[in-house]
């Protein structure tokens, strides 16, 4: 039988989770080029069109976590994420704000929504993420969301770069990032508390770290 390792304390476990930042999307060469102002309009359009597929699947991913979770106190904490992305009315929510960005980079909403520009690798990665949330234990789904730990700083840098290097882009269309930075700061505190509180054995802690590593791989794609 394999060696059984003792559970990490909360500080050690949080450190393991945070160590996965080394694989976060802001290190990807494409995003480094974006932040350096080296992308052309076509490259930005391709990115926005493909990122849409991830955006529109986030509510389904979160709904899967809620459906799998037997704890009402956790479900209540997670449900607002669905409304955040879907909005509470047409034209509201994170997905709607992403379509405003699509308008600004020169895409029509029709070509974004019908996903004609979607790359097979992006579809595979995002579908794998939704399947993960549907088929893995709910706490692993929550752990996979902890890329939010790294999102505020990376999104802030992205927003500065877009405003600085892409003057042709309507800066009012960057509202998705402005709202998401604050929201991610709140959500990561909540998700981290859930994971630290419910992953109290070493196997569950290791599974949470693997879930977060999987999510960084999804975003890298």
For the regions a protein language model found, what residue spans apply to each?
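Non-heme di-metal
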Residues: 2-221
């Amino acid at each position: 039988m394999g060696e059984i390792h003792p559970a990490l304390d909360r500080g050690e476990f949080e450190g393991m989770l945070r160590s996965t930042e080394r694989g976060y999307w802001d290190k990807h060469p494409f995003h480094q080029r974006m932040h350096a102002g080296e992308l052309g309009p076509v490259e930005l359009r391709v990115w926005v069109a493909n990122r849409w597929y991830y955006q529109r699947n986030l509510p389904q991913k979160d709904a899967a976590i809620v459906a799998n979770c037997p704890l009402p106190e956790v479900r209540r904490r997670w449900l607002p994420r669905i409304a955040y992305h879907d909005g509470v009315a047409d034209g509201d929510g994170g997905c709607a704000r992403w379509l405003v960005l699509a308008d600004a980079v020169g895409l029509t909403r029709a070509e974004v929504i019908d996903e004609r520009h979607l790359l097979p690798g992006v579809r595979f990665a995002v579908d794998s993420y939704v399947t993960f949330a549907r088929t893995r234990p709910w706490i692993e789904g929550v752990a996979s969301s902890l890329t939010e730990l790294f999102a505020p700083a990376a999104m802030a840098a992205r927003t500065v770069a877009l405003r600085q290097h892409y003057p042709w882009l309507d800066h009012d269309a960057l509202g998705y990032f402005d709202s998401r930075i604050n929201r991610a700061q709140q959500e990561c505190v909540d998700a981290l508390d859930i994971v630290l509180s419910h992953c109290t054995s070493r196997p569950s802690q290791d599974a949470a770290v693997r879930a977060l590593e999987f999510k960084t791989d999804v975003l890298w794609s």
